[in-house]
Regions:
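Active-site beta-strand/loop microenvironment that shapes enzyme catalytic pockets
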Residues: 72
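Flexible "stalk/tail and boundary" regions
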Residues: 5-11, 15-61, 66, 75-119
């Protein structure tokens, strides 16, 4: 984890599947806020139950080692197609970890979205 993000993570954090084939890293505090939001959803909805089940079954608590590294579980590495080079970036309330290849594929989509949103 780049040094600029280590202090905000503190000692422990949670890794989970993110959108678009990346891994999200949450502080314990932000993970707790997400859990509280999920509790407000209608648990009687099968799609919501399935989403929550998948999210929690593939989430993993982790601790930074003395060099600021985390062990990424095999299921998350496989999901994010991470095998070599990474891109790590801050994204508001979380850190995103991407396969460099997948991250670069999204560049053209990003430019198109900026134009679509008038930015």
């Amino acid at each position: 984890i780049p040094e600029k993000y280590r202090n905000q993570l503190g000692g422990e954090s949670v890794l989970s599947r993110g959108y678009d084939r990346c891994i999200y890293i949450y502080t314990m505090e932000d993970w707790g806020l997400l859990v509280e939001k999920l509790k407000e959803l209608r648990q009687s909805d099968p799609a919501i139950r399935e989403f929550i089940r998948k999210l929690f079954s593939q989430a993993s608590e982790c601790k930074l080692d003395s060099q600021g590294r985390v062990i990424v579980p095999a299921n998350l590495k496989s999901y994010a197609r991470i095998d070599k080079d990474l891109v790590t970036l801050g994204a508001m309330d979380k850190i995103e970890v991407w396969s460099k290849e997948i991250f670069n594929e999204n560049d053209e989509d990003f430019i198109a979205k900026l134009a679509e949103y008038g930015l």
